[in-house]
Structures are given as C-alpha cells and as structure tokens.
A protein has these predicted regions:
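Substrate-binding/active-site clefts of carbohydrate-active enzymes
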Residues: 26-186
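An acidic, Gly/Ser/Thr/Pro-rich helix-cap/linker signature
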Residues: 1-19, 29-38, 57
Length: 186
C-alpha cells in the first residue's frame, strides 16, 4: 500500500510506559454499533477508518480512535495468519480465535475483502498495520508455533514426521493439547 515502504515499527521510550491492548481483528469492529462501514466491519480495513463512533452518533469514539483516546501504545493482535476452522468465503458469522494454524505468516482470508486473492490479503493486512503505526500504536502479532491444526499439515506432506515430536511408538506427542506439537528443538 501507499507509504508502506516508509512505515516502521513504533518504538516505545520505556516499556514501563506501555499500555497494551489485546484484541481480535473481527471482534474489533464486527458489530454494527462500531460505526465502521459495512464493507470493512470485522476486516483488516476497519483499522483504516477514522472518525468512527458508537452507532454513528458522533459522541463516543470507537475502533482506532478509541484506542488513541485510551492512550494505548501497543496492540497485541490475536493470530491473524491463515487458520483452518473458518471458511474464508463462507458465512461471515463464523468465528474463531485463530489458534488453529494452517499456513504460518499468510494473512487470514476471512479478514480481507477478497479471500481468493493473496495480494489483497497482504495489502489489506499491511494497511491495518500501517494505520496503527500512523496512530502511534505498536503492533505485536500473537503467534502459535507449537502446533498445527492438523497432523496432515504442509510440514508433514513436505517431510513426513520431521517437523513434529513423535513418541517411540510413532504416535504424535500432544504437549500442546491440540493433537500434535511441533518439534521446535530440531
């Protein structure tokens, strides 16, 4: 997006002066009362809208303006890489926290205006990050590298058994509580 090449991480003077807000991209603006346009509600682009107010009444700020008013210095975004349990092109009422990773570092399609176009996902994700940076807010991405949604992941199809911790019986170790765990020690 325009200005991306000049964008940079927002550095804090002192970590003791930080105010961190954890949020879920869809929850941030999904409700109609958020004042975000219908096209951008629950999407990356919701973060690019300024001047949003509760029910559009002009009294109580919402979304990015609300974060600025609170003095939030950092947002920690729940996982927004490609996750399995939401049909990206399906019913918009589907919800997941994002802790069921499929493709690490690929922006989740359900948060984009066009889940079928990888370029759109990337551009809109970058626009969200840039809008937060432009507001003086640092961005932290919550990541889950200790497991994948399925044992039949791209890792296992590439090099079977290598990327996962296995018991001597060839069954998957389940230290993550999700049916498998990546072998981060390799």
């Amino acid at each position: 997006p325009e200005g991306w090449s000049n964008d940079s991480h927002v550095l804090l003077d002192k970590s003791t002066k930080s105010s961190v807000w954890e949020l879920h991209i869809k929850d941030f603006s999904y409700d109609k009362a958020s004042g975000v346009s219908d096209a951008n509600r629950g999407k990356y682009l919701a973060f690019t809208e300024s001047g949003t107010t509760l029910n559009g009444e002009g009294k109580v700020s919402t979304c990015i303006d609300y974060l600025k008013e609170l003095g939030v210095t950092t947002v920690q975004l729940n996982p927004f890489y490609d996750f399995q349990s939401v049909n990206e092109a399906g019913d918009d009422s589907q919800f997941n926290w994002g802790y069921d990773p499929v493709n690490y570092n690929v922006p989740e399609g359900s948060y984009s205006s066009n889940p079928y176009d990888g370029k759109v996902r990337i551009k809109e994700c970058k626009e969200m990050i840039k809008a937060l940076h432009d507001a003086g807010i640092s961005v932290v991405m919550d990541v889950v590298y200790n497991h994948t949604f399925s044992n039949d992941s791209c890792f296992n199809r590439t090099v079977p058994g290598y990327y996962y911790r296995m018991h001597s019986s060839s069954s998957y170790s389940n230290g993550s509580g999700c049916g498998n765990e990546t072998a981060s020690d390799k």
